[in-house]
Regions:
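Cytosolic, long alpha-helical scaffolding segments
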Residues: 1-111
Length: 111
């Protein structure tokens, strides 16, 4: 999406840029938490923080998708830009899902 945006010479609005930064910060937080859980002893770990971050990511994604529909409808920016924007948001959300999968696998108890 970033490459496509550059190829088409499209600029994100300041609001979109800020929203993407916020989502990327949450995914970065999720990755950092995952790394902490992977390094520590399994018996001393829990998934509470991982789930909290994942819930924040999902909530932000849902809010941004709804806002995007309104912004495109109100011609704040065009459909192509809105699609690229939401593609990036969706990819970040998928990364959050993958983090949860890794943490669940790491903390799964045998037997």
């Amino acid at each position: 999406s970033f490459n496509r945006r550059k190829e088409l010479n499209m600029e994100f609005t300041p609001e979109i840029t800020e929203n993407v930064k916020n989502m990327m910060q949450l995914t970065d937080d999720a990755l950092k938490e995952m790394n902490l859980l992977i390094k520590g002893p399994r018996e001393q770990q829990n998934m509470n923080e991982t789930f909290r971050i994942e819930n924040e990511i999902n909530s932000l994604r849902n809010r941004l998708k709804a806002e995007n529909i309104n912004n495109v409808d109100n011609r704040k920016y065009d459909y192509a830009l809105g699609t690229m924007y939401i593609d990036i948001i969706s990819e970040c959300e998928k990364l959050g899902d993958y983090v949860v999968n890794v943490v669940e696998a790491r903390l799964k108890k045998n037997g």
